[in-house]
């Protein structure tokens, strides 16, 4: 079994780290460079910066934040938000990022995945998916013909891809989209459950497992981490390759090292 990764996520708005619940009610959580240094010292395997307003508003000062972080932190850094072109990839990589995450632009312009992977390498291209459960009220609905339906304790649902920071549904089935981005050349999928986001009730294991079983790409589980057991569950039951978390680290409820110790106790390989 490959070593599992623990990845702190920093949602950045106007140069500050913020955290919300279900993609809303954002609260300030600190300075991105300072938090990055703390997580680096705690043993984080990677960091993810998501400029959460950039796809919807104009790009802010994320390049400056990336530069300042890359000067002081020496673990892989993934940056996403407002990346629309190959030139945007180039600018963020030059600022010090190791990987680029695309979400809205991948859905709007799928060929960007292919172009970027051919120029910069597949390892550089992370496709982020914001996904929400779409519960079925009418099983005979014609629109369900091309959807992957799952039974959950709350009822039957399919998983819908959202764009623009979770503001707009696309009607695209998440399983089918994951398979498509793999073919186009993505190197990794950052999979966020909008239903679980910020709740601290655990990752959406049905979603995570469904995507993990359908593609060969590494899957980063995101949304809902509230304790170390949730991370273990994401690896064991969700079959994720990495776990992303924010709130529990930002508000110092635990450290990266605490999480890794619990994962190791469950005979899951991690790097210290």
Swiss-Prot record:
PANTHER family listed in its UniProt record: IMIDAZOLE GLYCEROL PHOSPHATE SYNTHASE HISHF, IMIDAZOLE GLYCEROL PHOSPHATE SYNTHASE SUBUNIT HISF/H IGP SYNTHASE SUBUNIT HISF/H
Example of a GO MF term: lyase activity
Active site (catalytic residues): 11, 130
Predominant cellular place of this UniProt entry's protein: cytoplasm
UniProt cross-references to HAMAP family, sorted A to Z: HisF
Gene source species: Methanococcus maripaludis (strain C6 / ATCC BAA-1332)
Pathway(s): Amino-acid biosynthesis; L-histidine biosynthesis; L-histidine from 5-phospho-alpha-D-ribose 1-diphosphate: step 5/9
Entry keyword set: Amino-acid biosynthesis, Cytoplasm, Histidine biosynthesis, Lyase
Protein's UniProt keywords contain Lyase: yes
This protein's name: Imidazole glycerol phosphate synthase subunit HisF
Family: Belongs to the HisA/HisF family.
Role description: IGPS catalyzes the conversion of PRFAR and glutamine to IGP, AICAR and glutamate. The HisF subunit catalyzes the cyclization activity that produces IGP and AICAR from PRFAR using the ammonia provided by the HisH subunit.
Subunit structure: Heterodimer of HisH and HisF.
Reaction catalyzed: 5-[(5-phospho-1-deoxy-D-ribulos-1-ylimino)methylamino]-1-(5-phospho-beta-D-ribosyl)imidazole-4-carboxamide + L-glutamine = D-erythro-1-(imidazol-4-yl)glycerol 3-phosphate + 5-amino-1-(5-phospho-beta-D-ribosyl)imidazole-4-carboxamide + L-glutamate + H(+)
EC number(s) stated in the UniProt entry for this protein: 4.3.2.10
GO CC term (a single one): cytoplasm
Source taxonomy: Archaea, Methanobacteriati, Methanobacteriota, Methanomada group, Methanococci
Subcellular locations according to the entry: Cytoplasm
One of the protein's GO biological processes: L-histidine biosynthetic process
Pfam families registered for this protein in UniProt: His_biosynth (PF00977)
Keyword Lyase set for record: yes
